[in-house]
């Protein structure tokens, strides 16, 4: 059965991006089903208006509750999944959240706009997710990478589970360096260990590189890692070379 994702947005055409590349192929194979729905279609306003001035004054406009709530209720008829709002007050999205959500069978995402949504909509929302401490033009900009990162973890989307298990963040570390042909480029050679054909040595080298890159570039992540005996030994051995 396909993982079903419904996206509520004012700009459904932005999600045509999912019809291409890896996600597009997964949709064609029936592994994923992603549909975007225009919130404006649910507006009872004769001009299909979906925003209004905030009570109490202030800059900008706020999305009105009626179209959003009605669209959620409509989708809930055939989608019993969590309702997730992309907003700045949510918990920061990361790989662990992606892994958790990739196990769901159905999900509904809401993309906000303007100065946000009417507070009374939140009782219909199960979870709020943020990409980080910065402001985007609209929730669509956040929804695309969130949905992409979730979908690629769904079994069958990638050709092999190893494709994502060795990527940055999946195991709490940043990814090791990658090399391809030519063997020498602008005087810089591919590390000899990668040409050796010795799989265990290659594994150890990659693990060491992941550890050192994470320690240097993301010390906050490195502090959360419980180093194994092998990790400690690798750091000791390679640091002497």
From Swiss-Prot:
Its EC number is 2.1.1.228. GO terms for molecular function: tRNA (guanine(37)-N1)-methyltransferase activity. GO terms for biological process: tRNA N1-guanine methylation. S-adenosyl-L-methionine binds at residues 112, 131-136. It is an enzyme of class 2 (transferase). It catalyses: guanosine(37) in tRNA + S-adenosyl-L-methionine = N(1)-methylguanosine(37) in tRNA + S-adenosyl-L-homocysteine + H(+). Keywords: Cytoplasm, Methyltransferase, S-adenosyl-L-methionine, Transferase, tRNA processing. Homodimer. Belongs to the RNA methyltransferase TrmD family. NCBIfam families: PRK00026.1, trmD. This is tRNA (guanine-N(1)-)-methyltransferase. It comes from Clostridium novyi (strain NT). The gene is trmD.
